[in-house]
From Swiss-Prot:
HAMAP family: DNA_HJ_migration_RuvB. Homohexamer. Forms an RuvA(8)-RuvB(12)-Holliday junction (HJ) complex. HJ DNA is sandwiched between 2 RuvA tetramers; dsDNA enters through RuvA and exits via RuvB. An RuvB hexamer assembles on each DNA strand where it exits the tetramer. Each RuvB hexamer is contacted by two RuvA subunits (via domain III) on 2 adjacent RuvB subunits; this complex drives branch migration. In the full resolvosome a probable DNA-RuvA(4)-RuvB(12)-RuvC(2) complex forms which resolves the HJ. GO terms for biological process: DNA recombination; DNA repair. Belongs to the RuvB family. The keyword Nucleotide-binding applies. InterPro entries: AAA+_ATPase, AAA_lid_4, DNA_helicase_Holl-junc_RuvB, P-loop_NTPase, RuvB-like_N, RuvB_C, WH-like_DNA-bd_sf, WH_DNA-bd_sf. Keywords: ATP-binding, Cytoplasm, DNA damage, DNA recombination, DNA repair, DNA-binding, Hydrolase, Nucleotide-binding. The RuvA-RuvB-RuvC complex processes Holliday junction (HJ) DNA during genetic recombination and DNA repair, while the RuvA-RuvB complex plays an important role in the rescue of blocked DNA replication forks via replication fork reversal (RFR). RuvA specifically binds to HJ cruciform DNA, conferring on it an open structure. The RuvB hexamer acts as an ATP-dependent pump, pulling dsDNA into and through the RuvAB complex. RuvB forms 2 homohexamers on either side of HJ DNA bound by 1 or 2 RuvA tetramers; 4 subunits per hexamer contact DNA at a time. This is Holliday junction branch migration complex subunit RuvB. Disulfide bonds: none annotated. Residues 1-180 are annotated as: Large ATPase domain (RuvB-L). ATP binds at residues 19-20, 61, 64-66, 127-129, 170, 180, 217.
Amino acid sequence: MRSISCSKEYAEDVRNLNIRPEQLDDFFGQKDLIQNLKVFINAAKTRTEALDHVLLHGPPGLGKTTLAQIISKELRVSFRATSGPLLNKAGDLAAVLTTLNAKDVLFIDEIHRLNRSIEEVLYTAMEDFCLDLLVGEGPSTRTLRIDLPPFTLVGATTRLGLLSAPLRDRFGIPLRLEFYSFEELVDIIKRGTKVFSAEIEEDAIQEIACRARGTPRIALRLLRRIRDFVEVKDNKKITHKIADSALSKLGIDKMGLNKLDVDYLRFLFNTSGSVGIDTISIALSEDSGNIEETVEPYLVKISFVKRTPRGRVLTDQGKEYLSLQY
């Protein structure tokens, strides 16, 4: 079995552990979600039970991994992490689950990428805290039942629609993370500047927040790259002028859109009517999954694009943006 590891996004986040909040009270944004999660965690602790299984879903970079880690810290239990693509067979899942202690948190990132055979094994683990594994071959095949301690599965996905209904329904606490407000991103960037020991003007912070697509991961990534420009030029402070110049060099416009976003919008503009995702994928030479996960959510949020049963449609706001930019 491949060892428990991290997805690409999880590995990127690990490099910034000192930026992450470690308790719910320090978590910026997602106010209603956080308040509800506090209730669920405190109730589980009061009953001395394992927290019910949690499903975190929403666009990339909004804090799903961070929340999973905070849940384990709030519960004061161990945290184990893996991802859907790493669990190729039932034995892989069994090897992970049998290492858990009572009430531990198991985090499965990209849970929508679990294959169906693994999902079926997971059903009994989630509901009955046991594993039913087939042992042997042919006529000698038998079922081996392994009892498990009560545990909490925290699944994370950017593609909720790809989860099978039976798996989705086994999560007692489904939580959707939303894009962050401008004010919340400003607070997150300020925290980042303290960790990076970076001196920065308020106008520069606001400029980064405006271009961060409502996403903390992007905000902190842009902050790091701007800091690179500052250090190479031996400047002492991140000014608004420096931030604006660096972001332009990075290909990030005033709305936070990059070349792929603009190419997507222009293709819709040049195509009459609605357009299917596969057609867009071929035209842009870009994976359709990446378009659905990283491009479309923000364009839909800012009302540049509508997703309809017949395909994607450029809105009047999207057309106006293109007319002003090009």
